Regions:
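Catalytic domains of riboflavin
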Residues: 1-373
Length: 373
């Protein structure tokens, strides 16, 4: 089945229709119904709970959550994909139990009204708001961000109603199931990867500030400085060779005082990628890029040591939320530098919709592999 273009999805969102959006097969590998929150009707909620069967959620921007004084459900997010649930809500007026399709639609419309205020809603309730990351799918490639992006691109309030699609037997619907669902109900269907690609093509969210040659302990590198538009943090890229000419050795690195200054190993005894080790490894390659992601704050030393000393299963992403939230920035910088195929200095990780950035990981290289040589 041929997927629909992002332009087609945006047009349907603008017209008040639902669309299906799928994420990468190596992430949640699911599809959600998405529609503009400002257009939601009782029959739309009824369709979601009858045919999709997932949890009906309301995606909101950080600004809207602040406007409604909505706190996050938990301070420390341990969810696998770091979805930002706020406290559940109900409209303060015009409802009885709040669970009917009509009353859920009323709660949603109340929350996204232009002049909505905290007193218009109460907690808890039967609608589950999700706070999107600033920067949308270029920052975190989840359905939460995709819903806000699609509605914003449609010229509407950046808020959407989303619901996971579940098969008749209770299992999650995967792409073949979702294509059948879309055809059966006459819905447009697309991917978050395509939405990322659309935004990368039509928007500039990371700007290059400067370029200069610097000399390091490991030789000369080209130093590029970047900044996200609307964000004061500075990101750096150290480049060796010409990334456009072939497979490039890449490290996307966030500063950690324990790992980078004290050079402690992980709790399981394995070696962590320090800034020094990554730079040395890249210097030994024909082509390499080290992207240093700036942060608005540095975690305190005690917390950093505790975090590094906690055993974490390979495929658990709970401790990787910071990496999931910043990989989009690193990916944009890599694309600006011409990187396409890369050897990634990292343990195997599932990055959100990486294909949307036209990036391909051909090999993962762990720090232990390098130090064992």
């Amino acid at each position: 089945m041929q997927l629909n273009s992002v332009e087609e999805l945006i047009a349907d969102i603008r017209a008040g229709r639902m669309v299906i959006l799928m994420d990468d097969e190596d992430r949640e590998n699911e599809g959600d119904l998405i529609m503009a929150a400002s257009h939601v009707r009782p029959e739309d909620i009824n369709f979601m709970i009858t045919h999709a069967r997932g949890l009906v959620c309301l995606t909101l921007s950080r600004e809207r959550c602040k406007q409604l004084n909505l706190p996050l459900m938990v301070d420390q997010n341990g969810a696998q994909h770091a979805t930002n649930f706020t406290l559940s809500i109900e409209a303060a007026e015009g409802i009885s139990t709040g669970i009917s399709a009509a009353e859920r639609a009323h709660t949603i419309r109340t929350a996204v009204a232009a002049h909505a205020k905290p007193s218009d809603i109460v907690q808890p309730g039967h609608i589950f708001p999700l706070m999107a990351q600033p920067g949308g799918v270029l920052h975190r490639a989840g359905h939460t961000e995709a819903g806000c992006d699609l509605t914003r691109l449609a010229g509407l309030e950046p808020a959407s109603v989303i619901c996971e699609i579940i098969n008749d037997d209770g299992t999650m619907a995967r792409r073949p199931d979702l294509e059948v669902f879309a055809e059966k109900h006459g819905l447009k269907i697309g991917t978050i990867a395509d939405l990322i690609h659309y935004r990368m093509t039509n928007e500039q969210t990371v700007e290059r500030l400067s370029q200069e040659t610097i000399n390091t302990e490991y030789g000369a590198f080209e130093l590029y400085k970047y900044r996200e538009i609307g964000n004061p943090d500075i990101h750096l890229a150290l480049v060796k060779g010409e990334p456009r000419q072939g497979v490039t050795t890449v490290r996307v690195h966030g500063f950690n005082p324990v790992r980078d200054l004290l050079k402690l190993n992980k709790a399981d005894g394995s070696t962590a990628w320090s800034l020094d080790l990554a730079l040395r490894t890249i210097s030994e390659s024909d082509r390499g890029v080290l992207v240093w992601i700036g942060q608005d704050h540095l975690e305190d030393l005690g917390h950093a040591i505790h975090h590094l000393n906690q055993p974490m299963p390979l495929k658990s992403n709970a401790a990787l939320s910071q990496q999931y939230q910043t990989i989009g920035v690193g990916a944009q910088i890599l694309r600006d530098l011409g990187v396409e195929k890369m050897k990634l200095l990292s343990s195997p990780l599932r990055f959100n919709a990486l294909s949307g950035f036209n990036l391909e990981v051909v090999e993962y290289i762990t720090a232990d592999q390098v130090t064992a040589k």
